[in-house]
């Protein structure tokens, strides 16, 4: 079990997370100087916050990063608590871009993308160091191209990590622990919800958990309904990082973190009885099992965010705006 499951899974997960962090850091370097200003100026209403939260999360490839930034801005007094509600809903929609890309089965592009990204980075590094082209060396676009090469490298590593993790699917399928879990999940899909929440809270990445589930569903190791339950749980578990980030902050910052939990948990609990319908819709959209999981994640987050959006306009939330 150690050699066939744990070691390959940990290696694949490490490569996947390395790719995710490279993408996040490089994209944050590209957008970082403008992100705080955009969030501050463009979130006057919940619907504006939803739009900005969606775009910034899709660009940064990290809902956690945007949520933590929002909490930090609230703690610093740059944003008020009511203005973050739309941002939180938007991050849930924007994060679907990652799972949709994984669901496209672009694994064959990993090596070409890695070679291309390394070539781009080396070219920009040489142009920046050599004094043969002073005009190019001082060009403003050079750092942007360099950061773009790091983004491509991160995406290539993400695809490589997914391939490695999905490769242990058959070994996991034969393990007694997985058989026990499937038996319990056949009795109640709530086991899948709990597993998704706990695993995502432990690894701090809903994309990694959902990616693994895509692999299991693709090889038939897990039924689509159970996979959807795990996805719903992952949307709850992803709130753990925001809760940790709010510790020691202001009451307003803590309200943001707990609002994230309430909105995500409420949406998951609301859609649990409709897992069969979600599975039917996703099967109608895509014939690929991985694509079905990705589309379910997208449908769930869009619908739950739109359902919750009108409640963000209630006067109650304006009164819940402590100064400290």
State each model region's role.
Residues 1-50, 144-198, 216-219:
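Helix-loop-helix hairpins and the membrane-proximal interhelical loops
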Residues 22-30, 34, 100, 164-171, ...:
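Membrane-spanning helices that line or support transport/gating and their immediate boundary helices
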Residues 162, 174, 178-182, 253-324:
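Transmembrane alpha-helical segments and their short flanking loops
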Residues 3, 7, 145, 149, ...:
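Alpha-helical transmembrane segments of multi-pass inner-membrane proteins
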Residues 2-8, 85-88, 101-165:
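Signature of multi-pass transmembrane helix bundles
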């Amino acid at each position: 079990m150690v050699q066939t499951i744990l070691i390959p899974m940990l290696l694949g997960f490490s490569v996947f997370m390395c790719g995710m962090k490279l993408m996040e850091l490089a994209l944050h370097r590209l957008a970082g100087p403008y992100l705080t200003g955009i969030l501050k100026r463009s979130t006057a209403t919940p619907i504006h916050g939803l739009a900005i939260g969606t775009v910034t999360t899709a660009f940064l490839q990290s809902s956690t990063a945007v949520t933590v930034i929002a909490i930090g801005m609230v703690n610093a007094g740059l944003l008020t608590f009511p203005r973050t509600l739309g941002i939180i809903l938007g991050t849930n929609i924007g994060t679907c871009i990652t799972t949709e890309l994984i669901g496209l089965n672009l694994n064959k592009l990993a090596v070409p993308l890695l070679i291309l990204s390394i070539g781009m980075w080396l070219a920009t590094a040489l142009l920046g160091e050599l004094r043969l082209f002073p005009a190019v060396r001082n060009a403003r676009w050079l750092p942007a191209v360099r950061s773009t090469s790091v983004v491509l490298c991160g995406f290539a590593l993400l695809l490589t990590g997914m391939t490695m993790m999905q490769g242990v699917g058959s070994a996991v399928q034969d393990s007694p622990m997985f058989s026990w879990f499937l038996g319990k999940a056949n009795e109640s899909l709530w086991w899948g919800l709990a597993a998704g929440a706990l695993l995502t809270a432990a690894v701090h990445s809903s994309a990694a958990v959902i990616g693994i589930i895509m692999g299991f569903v693709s090889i038939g190791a897990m039924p689509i309904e159970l996979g959807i339950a795990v996805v719903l749980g992952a949307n709850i578990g992803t709130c753990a990082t925001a809760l940790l980030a709010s510790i020691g902050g202001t009451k307003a910052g803590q309200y943001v973190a707990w609002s994230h939990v309430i909105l995500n948990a409420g949406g998951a609990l609301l859609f649990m009885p409709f897992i069969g319908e979600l599975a039917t819709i996703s099967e109608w959209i895509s014939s690929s099992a991985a694509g079905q999981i990705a589309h379910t994640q997208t449908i769930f987050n869009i619908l739950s965010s739109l359902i919750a959006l009108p409640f963000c306009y209630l006067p109650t939330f304006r009164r819940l705006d402590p100064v400290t």
